[in-house]
């Protein structure tokens, strides 16, 4: 078999007159009665191959048996297309290959999905036949971008003198965060490894080990409830460095991301990226990962509401809650009463009891609650919300967390429905100064907002013992277009501070020693100040490739129920395997 001389998508007019050897899949076959045209596809694109009895009767006879997705080896001569046959939508649209020989390397059954970017297959069918789904050009291009992003990051970190170091996949189960995936030990009866949720502790120990600059394209595992931008196993760009300040880490990441955007996407983004404190993000956008491609910020009306005539507003403020509103400019005529009812049901999903609304008309405010506002109050509302005729004003009065969640989500919905978002924009944002801890009323304890190894502000260390809820974290999240790309922080590197953190989280001394004794001891051997960040590679590629589902950026992903439709994992194992591990199943009965 002759070697391939050209990729299908790379045969151009420069090759006219040459004999070429092509190998690929049949995208489409057209029989025009005496002539057969085949679109031959490989990962670079498509080229048209013509089977003509005047060129080769033998090749034409073989072509008559060929169907879609057959794998072919074609030998032929490159010729220019006639003037009326030129297809400028194809890179190879000015030429075609006159086949002299063809060899069927493999036949194919009729495929259960259409191998094309606009396939009509459901996602379940695509995942079951993932090897066919991956043949679609849009899928290959996504993974080519993933490769380019990873290569750019590796090259950048190499120039910054980072070492790529692999950390263990079989490790120790620790509390906090999501549930671990557990792996039973055959050698140690009744004991389990855990698959890492992140390399957090090991990368900190590498800093203790004097490596100073580490990175890893790390596989991570979390047994958590899934959604469109979550998977049980995922890849993160894990980075840690000693002796750097927060500003130095953020500056380095900005330089890395601007290079990624330019090299992998061909887009210039300017640095430094904007920075916003967590409290400001929540106040202005109702989100810790705001999409800043459009405005429509939340406005706090609590002071006004406390003295207005609308009891729903006043009682919310009196009970310690707040009232906030968003002004959907020019949207009054676009939302009927039925549409607003749908918005009301939408905010209820986020805990809101309802959605108050007003439309601004030339002669004043109109809507179910307009009667509660006199002329003076109406003017204050209009001025505060910068409202003009044609605007739609939407209000939520509730607990602060409910107001933020519901209006933050409503803002995003309106941004999409009103087409306010410029999809060509890439808006990066740092969210900084996070709370160190979050209180869970159900569990009656504090949890780490990021993780238990995040350094508090120096002046807040003592608050861990006196007022933990007030302690701020030296933490930062990188946000792109309303998605959290990753998070990082400066780390605790002193034993006494780490012990205070564990105590604030409700760990006894014994529990802390049992779970993290190796880390606490390491801190006694001259641990340097250090910090880092972890960026979600899958999510970054999803955004750059314009995909809406994380599964499209992972070669063999899991479904929303954490199963693989291709291999049918997870699956039962043989009784002998369980016996070898000294395990016995005790399954709960379905109710």
From Swiss-Prot:
<dbReference type="InterPro" id="IPR004115">
    <property type="entry name" value="GAD-like_sf"/>
</dbReference>
<dbReference type="GO" id="GO:0006422">
    <property type="term" value="P:aspartyl-tRNA aminoacylation"/>
</dbReference>
<feature type="binding site">
    <location>
        <begin position="536"/>
        <end position="539"/>
    </location>
    <ligand>
        <name>ATP</name>
    </ligand>
</feature>
<dbReference type="InterPro" id="IPR029351">
    <property type="entry name" value="GAD_dom"/>
</dbReference>
<dbReference type="GO" id="GO:0005524">
    <property type="term" value="F:ATP binding"/>
</dbReference>
<dbReference type="InterPro" id="IPR004364">
    <property type="entry name" value="Aa-tRNA-synt_II"/>
</dbReference>
<dbReference type="GO" id="GO:0016740">
    <property type="term" value="F:transferase activity"/>
</dbReference>
<dbReference type="InterPro" id="IPR012340">
    <property type="entry name" value="NA-bd_OB-fold"/>
</dbReference>
<dbReference type="Pfam" id="PF02938">
    <property type="entry name" value="GAD"/>
</dbReference>
<feature type="binding site">
    <location>
        <position position="450"/>
    </location>
    <ligand>
        <name>L-aspartate</name>
    </ligand>
</feature>
<dbReference type="InterPro" id="IPR047090">
    <property type="entry name" value="AspRS_core"/>
</dbReference>
<feature type="binding site">
    <location>
        <position position="231"/>
    </location>
    <ligand>
        <name>ATP</name>
    </ligand>
</feature>
<keyword id="KW-0963">Cytoplasm</keyword>
<protein>
    <recommendedName>
        <fullName>Aspartate--tRNA(Asp/Asn) ligase</fullName>
        <ecNumber>6.1.1.23</ecNumber>
    </recommendedName>
</protein>
<dbReference type="Pfam" id="PF00152">
    <property type="entry name" value="tRNA-synt_2"/>
</dbReference>
<dbReference type="GO" id="GO:0005737">
    <property type="term" value="C:cytoplasm"/>
</dbReference>
<feature type="binding site">
    <location>
        <position position="491"/>
    </location>
    <ligand>
        <name>L-aspartate</name>
    </ligand>
</feature>
<dbReference type="InterPro" id="IPR002312">
    <property type="entry name" value="Asp/Asn-tRNA-synth_IIb"/>
</dbReference>
<comment type="function">
    <text>Aspartyl-tRNA synthetase with relaxed tRNA specificity since it is able to aspartylate not only its cognate tRNA(Asp) but also tRNA(Asn). Reaction proceeds in two steps: L-aspartate is first activated by ATP to form Asp-AMP and then transferred to the acceptor end of tRNA(Asp/Asn).</text>
</comment>
<dbReference type="GO" id="GO:0004815">
    <property type="term" value="F:aspartate-tRNA ligase activity"/>
</dbReference>
<dbReference type="GO" id="GO:0050560">
    <property type="term" value="F:aspartate-tRNA(Asn) ligase activity"/>
</dbReference>
<feature type="site" description="Important for tRNA non-discrimination">
    <location>
        <position position="84"/>
    </location>
</feature>
<feature type="binding site">
    <location>
        <begin position="222"/>
        <end position="224"/>
    </location>
    <ligand>
        <name>ATP</name>
    </ligand>
</feature>
<keyword id="KW-0067">ATP-binding</keyword>
<dbReference type="GO" id="GO:0003676">
    <property type="term" value="F:nucleic acid binding"/>
</dbReference>
<feature type="binding site">
    <location>
        <position position="176"/>
    </location>
    <ligand>
        <name>L-aspartate</name>
    </ligand>
</feature>
<dbReference type="GO" id="GO:0140096">
    <property type="term" value="F:catalytic activity, acting on a protein"/>
</dbReference>
<comment type="similarity">
    <text>Belongs to the class-II aminoacyl-tRNA synthetase family. Type 1 subfamily.</text>
</comment>
<dbReference type="InterPro" id="IPR004524">
    <property type="entry name" value="Asp-tRNA-ligase_1"/>
</dbReference>
<comment type="subunit">
    <text>Homodimer.</text>
</comment>
<dbReference type="InterPro" id="IPR006195">
    <property type="entry name" value="aa-tRNA-synth_II"/>
</dbReference>
<feature type="binding site">
    <location>
        <position position="484"/>
    </location>
    <ligand>
        <name>ATP</name>
    </ligand>
</feature>
<dbReference type="InterPro" id="IPR047089">
    <property type="entry name" value="Asp-tRNA-ligase_1_N"/>
</dbReference>
<feature type="binding site">
    <location>
        <position position="222"/>
    </location>
    <ligand>
        <name>L-aspartate</name>
    </ligand>
</feature>
<keyword id="KW-0436">Ligase</keyword>
<dbReference type="InterPro" id="IPR045864">
    <property type="entry name" value="aa-tRNA-synth_II/BPL/LPL"/>
</dbReference>
<dbReference type="InterPro" id="IPR004365">
    <property type="entry name" value="NA-bd_OB_tRNA"/>
</dbReference>
<dbReference type="Pfam" id="PF01336">
    <property type="entry name" value="tRNA_anti-codon"/>
</dbReference>
<keyword id="KW-0648">Protein biosynthesis</keyword>
<feature type="region of interest" description="Aspartate">
    <location>
        <begin position="200"/>
        <end position="203"/>
    </location>
</feature>
<keyword id="KW-0547">Nucleotide-binding</keyword>
<keyword id="KW-0030">Aminoacyl-tRNA synthetase</keyword>
């Amino acid at each position: 078999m002759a070697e391939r001389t050209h990729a299908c998508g790379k045969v151009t007019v420069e090759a006219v007159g040459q004999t070429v050897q092509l190998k690929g899949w049949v995208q489409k076959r057209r029989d025009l009665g005496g002539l057969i045209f085949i679109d031959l596809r490989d990962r670079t694109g498509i080229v048209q191959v013509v089977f003509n009895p005047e060129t080769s009767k033998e090749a034409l006879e073989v072509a008559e048996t060929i169907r879609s997705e057959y794998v072919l080896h074609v030998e032929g001569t490159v010729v220019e297309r006639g003037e009326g046959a030129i297809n400028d939508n194809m890179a190879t649209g000015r030429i075609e290959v006159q086949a002299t020989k063809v060899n069927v390397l493999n036949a194919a059954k009729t495929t259960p999905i259409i191998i094309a970017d606009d396939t009509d297959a459901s996602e379940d069918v695509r995942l079951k036949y993932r090897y066919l789904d991956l043949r679609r050009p849009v899928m290959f291009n996504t993974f080519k971008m993933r490769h380019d992003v990873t290569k750019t990051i590796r090259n950048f970190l190499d120039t910054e003198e980072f070492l790529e170091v692999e950390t263990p996949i079989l490790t120790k189960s620790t509390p906090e965060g999501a549930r671990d995936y557990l792996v039973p030990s055959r050698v140690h009866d009744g004991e389990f490894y855990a698959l890492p949720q992140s390399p957090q502790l090991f990368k900190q120990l590498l800093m203790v080990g004097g490596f100073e600059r580490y990175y890893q394209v790390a596989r991570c595992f979390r047994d958590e409830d899934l959604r469109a931008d979550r998977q049980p196993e995922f890849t993160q760009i894990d980075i840690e460095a000693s002796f750097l300040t927060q500003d130095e880490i953020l500056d380095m990441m900005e330089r890395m991301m601007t290079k990624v955007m330019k090299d992998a996407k061909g887009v210039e983004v300017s640095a430094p990226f904007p920075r916003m404190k967590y409290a400001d993000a929540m106040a202005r956008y109702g989100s810790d990962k705001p999409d800043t491609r459009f405005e429509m910020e939340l406005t706090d009306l609590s002071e006004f509401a406390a003295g207005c005539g609308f009891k729903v507003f006043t009682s919310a403020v009196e009970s310690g809650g707040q009232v906030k509103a968003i002004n959907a400019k020019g949207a009054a005529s676009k939302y009927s009463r039925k549409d607003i009812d749908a918005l009301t049901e939408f905010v209820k999903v986020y805990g809101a009891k309802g959605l108050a609304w007003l439309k601004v008309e030339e002669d004043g405010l109109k809507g179910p609650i307009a009667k509660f506002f006199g002329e003076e109050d109406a003017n204050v509302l209009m001025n505060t919300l910068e409202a003009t005729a044609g605007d739609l004003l939407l209000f939520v009065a509730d607990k602060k967390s409910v107001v933020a969640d519901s209006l933050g989500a409503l803002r995003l919905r309106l941004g999409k429905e009103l087409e306010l978002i410029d999809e060509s924009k890439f808006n990066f944002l740092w969210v900084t100064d996070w709370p160190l801890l979050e209180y869970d009323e159900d569990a009656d304890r504090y949890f780490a907002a990021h993780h238990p190894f995040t350094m508090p502000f120096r002046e807040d260390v003592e608050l861990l013992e006196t007022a933990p809820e007030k302690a701020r974290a030296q933490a930062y999240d990188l946000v792109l277009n309303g998605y959290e790309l990753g998070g990082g922080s400066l780390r605790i590197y002193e034993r006494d501070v780490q012990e205070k953190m564990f105590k604030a989280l409700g760990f006894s001394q014994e529990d802390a020693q049992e779970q993290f004794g190796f880390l606490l001891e390491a801190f006694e051997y001259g641990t340097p100040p250090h910090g880092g960040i972890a960026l979600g590679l899958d999510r970054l590629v999803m955004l750059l490739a314009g995909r809406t589902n994380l599964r499209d950026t992972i070669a063999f992903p899991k479904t929303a129920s954490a199963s693989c439709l291709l291999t049918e994992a997870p699956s039962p194992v043989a009784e002998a395997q369980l016996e070898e591990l000294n395990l016995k199943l005790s399954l709960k009965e379905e109710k």
